[in-house]
Design a protein with these regions (language model features):
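Flexible interdomain linker/hinge and immediately adjacent N-terminus
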Residues: 1-16, 103-106
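Short, polar N-cap/turn motifs at the start of nucleic acid-interacting alpha helices
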Residues: 52-54, 156-176
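Short, charged phosphate-coordinating catalytic segments
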Residues: 34-56
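Short, basic (Lys/Arg/His-rich) helix/loop patches that form interaction surfaces
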Residues: 117-163
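C-terminal secondary-structure termini that scaffold catalytic or DNA-interacting sites
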Residues: 2, 9, 191-217
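C-terminal catalytic core of Y-nucleophile DNA break-rejoin enzymes
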Residues: 67-88, 97-121
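Short alpha-helical segment immediately N-terminal to, or the first helix within
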Residues: 21, 33-34, 150-151, 163-164, ...
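Basic, Lys/Arg- and aromatic-enriched nucleic-acid-binding interface segment
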Residues: 8, 12-41
Length: 217
């Protein structure tokens, strides 16, 4: 059975390898925000310097998916100390304008195509391939799927992942990530059950596989 697109994701080692491949502060910042908040690339492109709350360690997203003038789909998301430090270094003394600026015009925000290139180029430098075999290059959305999958695997409740990811309905989070991947299932199966099988087998029977050689029933 073919995997659904949201079942393909990176592990933390792969994510950190891609981040480590950044050539400058801008690339590092883009990768860290995508990987550590699950933010959509559109949302990242619209972030402003004033949307960073350094004291409370939060980013304020004013224009989420489906935002309108009457319903801006705003939300706050937590951010880690390392990413905040990267933001401080990148901004320097600047306190206004877009958080991540365009390569072409300093007063414009980073474009979606620039975000795509940063993710793709850093993944190539790190020699980390897109886990989806149908896609040649790494793309920003794989970071979003990875964040949600890894957060749930770490024990973060569904409603919290929903809030951070900006899903309007918890059912979206449940439908997309509610079923653990076969990789996670296999790992837990091996960690939690296999030893029990062997332990019970030793206690209940001394039979060896060689005892059944040649017997089909």
């Amino acid at each position: 059975m073919a995997k659904k697109f949201n079942e393909y994701y990176l592990n933390w080692d792969e994510i950190n390898q891609i981040i480590a491949a950044a050539k400058n502060l801008k690339e590092s910042l883009v990768l860290k925000i995508l990987a550590r908040t699950g933010m959509r690339r559109f949302e990242l492109s619209k972030l402003e310097a004033k949307d960073v709350d350094f004291e409370r360690k939060r980013l304020f997203i004013k224009k989420g998916k489906g935002a309108t003038e009457k319903d801006p789909k705003s939300r706050a998301v937590p951010i880690d100390d390392d990413t905040l430090q990267t933001i401080k270094f990148y901004l320097g003394s600047r306190k206004t304008g877009f958080l991540v600026q365009s390569n072409k015009k300093s007063h414009d925000g980073i474009s979606l195509s620039q975000i795509n290139r940063i993710v793709s180029n850093c993944a190539k430098r790190a020699n980390v391939k897109n886990p989806n075999p149908k896609l040649k290059n790494m793309n920003p959305h794989i970071f979003r799927h990875s964040f949600s999958r890894l957060s749930l695997a770490a024990g973060i409740p569904f409603n919290m992942v929903q809030r951070i990811a900006g899903h309007a309905d918890a059912r979206t989070t449940l439908q997309m990530y509610g079923v653990p991947s076969i990789t996670d299932t296999q790992q837990l199966y091996d960690e939690k059950l296999v030893d029990k099988f062997q332990e019970k087998s030793k206690n209940k029977s001394n039979a060896k596989l060689t005892d059944f050689t040649g017997k089909s029933e």
